[in-house]
A protein has these predicted regions:
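A short alpha-helical cap/connector motif
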Residues: 1-134
Length: 134
């Protein structure tokens, strides 16, 4: 992604910091949660992060790695705009993706690796393709 594209994505997200869902059903598990839905739906106007993730993902084709997926809000944001040729690796040390549905969990493009020890070189090399590790 070049600098001009990145600036455009950031600008568009600033002017409309809400996810434009491709599949609104992905957010069904969080829709009635009065704590976390504030963040993903940006109900107070202070949480455009998930919209930015969504917008960035829609402009990327390849492997996406998310570090820290607590509750799964980032996974929802990324998955909704994940291209058919892309993969998502989402890693956390805590196994809590309560808002991620079975459709996402069973998608072969999605790899949710919780309780992941990033310092274990054997696990890292076994999980990722050799050329993708830098």
């Amino acid at each position: 992604m070049n600098h001009t594209t990145l600036e455009k994505i950031i600008s568009e997200t600033q002017s409309s910091p809400y996810i434009k869902w491709n599949d609104e059903s992905l957010a069904d598990l969080i829709r009635n949660d009065n704590v976390y839905n504030v963040f993903i739906f940006n109900k107070d106007g202070n949480h455009g992060y998930f919209s930015l993730l969504h917008n960035l993902t829609s402009n990327i084709e390849g492997t996406i790695v998310e570090l820290g997926n607590r509750e799964g809000l980032g996974i929802l944001s990324i998955y909704d705009s994940l291209s058919e040729n892309s993969e998502l690796y989402s890693l956390d040390i805590v196994d809590d993706v309560r808002f991620v549905n079975d459709k996402i969990k069973s998608d072969p493009r999605v790899h949710i690796l919780n309780d992941f020890d990033a310092l274990d070189s054997h696990t890292v090399s076994k999980t990722f393709k050799k050329k993708s590790i830098s």
